[in-house]
Amino acid sequence: MLTRRTLFPLVAGGLLAPRIARADLAGIEAAARKEGAITWYTAHTDGESAQIVADAFTQRYPEIKVTLIRTTAQVAYQRLLQDLKNGIAQCDVFSSTDLGHDEALRADGKFAKYAPENAKDLLPAFQGLDPAGTYYPTLSELVVPIYNTAKVKPADAPKSWPDLLDPKWRNQVAVGHPAYSGTVGTWVVAMRKLYGWEYFEKLEANRPLIGRSVNDAVGVLNSGERIVAAGPIGLSQVTAARGNPVGLVYPSDGAVLIVSPSAIMANAPHPNAARLFEEFLLGPTHARLSAEGYRLPVRAGTPVQPGAKPVDEIKVNRLTTAEIVQGIPEVIEQWRDTFGS
């Protein structure tokens, strides 16, 4: 039964790792080329960035067509659950921003066990995320305060998370929704841990504009519809680099780290292409593309973009998997009680 509350004791206590399939890259690649296709359900990044990744994979392996299904984490998860309920094998690789999804699917046997060759090059902070060897971190991101640089001076921009609660930002704040976005859900759990639910009761008094994805905040800042927000460093910096009025602050009380895994479905219709794609997501090309998108590399030896801060220079709040598994369902209900949606 895919319930997150019953998962918590398993996550907290850990599980013995069963035998994991090891990578035979030459054989996998040959078989993947024969399969010729892969379907990727992903909540990682925005749609444009996800398409860049899919195109890079196809450029390297022209025989393999990538069908990209990009949406928010909760929507992708519900679609996958519906597939499973109906006996439909469509998704090959599942990439969520909510670790609770990965834990639930792993515990229910929906993920294949696989040990990617490229997993050995993960940074130490990202090693061993799943001792059972089914999902691996393929992307990381930070959520920080962002602002419209045409309407807010740097000196006046929020310097910490409680600064978003200042009454001067009433009707000027934008956030995503934890019932749609795993990134937003993780951020909400982190804020509750730091400041209690009172943080969101005070935020509600500022009448925020609530989107779905964490990326929505960047769009409404860029348009000037709102002028401060909780947003992702990646899309924020890409948008700013294109000459748009989006700035960010590394908050004094810590950016929120989002660790986003990918896993191969046990019923993947293209299992070898899925393994090859998982290797690609953990490999140097995807690491470079992630860094070019101003996201945090999970692979060792990947340089950050000029002007971007390396993670060891940033104060970071990182939740445990158990905190995310237990916390996101709780804050979704609290959010609906407070914000009415």
Predicted regions and their residues:
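Periplasmic-binding protein-like
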Residues: E141, W169-A179, E201-E204, I210-G211, R242-A268, F280-V304, ...
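A ligand-binding cleft/hinge motif common to bilobed small-molecule-binding domains
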Residues: G100-A104, I227-P245
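Immediate post-signal peptide segment of exported/extracytoplasmic ligand-binding proteins
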Residues: A23-T39, D166-K168
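N-terminal secretory signal peptides and thylakoid transit peptides that target proteins
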Residues: M1-A12
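A bilobed periplasmic-binding-protein/Venus flytrap-type ligand-binding module shared by bacterial periplasmic
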Residues: I146-K151, V188-V189, I258-A273, L289-S290
